[in-house]
């Protein structure tokens, strides 16, 4: 299996990006940040949330969405949005695909979504909930993509510190 990619479009909250970075390190996933960012990458909040994993993160920054597209020609991109007509479990995530998430206050711009309806996905929710937390949403969709690939390259068995399972 190739490496999956998480793409954050103009993230605003450093703690969310730090948590997402930690999830990316734990899963062998690349993180792509599309500017402008609502924070500096050296802020304490991002380091605290990412803990000591941030230095191991494979992260790339882009000036804007057009810069991202130019540097990743032909990329297969899934757009995670509350506005999508299908759920995140309805699609098959290809090797090396990108899963894009929008900024916390507004999501992915609709002019991007309308051009990519067939690859827009949503996490089902009840009622009139606006959205889930960004880092939680990334984890939900990313782990579905990893599950579809049988968690290739990941540790599937845990170990007790002071006991044996047998």
Residue ranges and their predicted role:
Residues 1-166:
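Post-transcriptional modification and biogenesis factors for structured RNAs
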């Amino acid at each position: 299996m190739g490496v999956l990619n998480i793409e954050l479009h103009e993230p605003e909250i450093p703690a969310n990006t730090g948590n997402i970075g930690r999830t990316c390190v734990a899963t062998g996933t690349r993180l792509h940040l599309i500017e402008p960012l609502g924070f500096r990458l050296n802020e304490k909040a991002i380091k605290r949330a990412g803990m000591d994993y941030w230095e191991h993160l494979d992260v790339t920054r882009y000036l804007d969405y057009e810069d991202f597209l130019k540097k990743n020609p032909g990329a297969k991109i899934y757009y995670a949005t509350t506005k999508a007509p299908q759920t995140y479990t309805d699609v098959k995530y290809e090797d090396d695909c990108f899963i894009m998430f929008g900024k916390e206050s507004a999501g992915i711009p609709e002019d991007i979504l309308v051009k990519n309806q067939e690859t827009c996905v949503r996490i089902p929710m009840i009622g009139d909930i606006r959205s889930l937390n960004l880092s939680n949403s990334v984890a939900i969709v990313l782990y579905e993509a990893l599950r579809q690939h049988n968690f290739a390259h990941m540790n599937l068995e845990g170990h007790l510190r002071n006991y044996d399972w047998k």
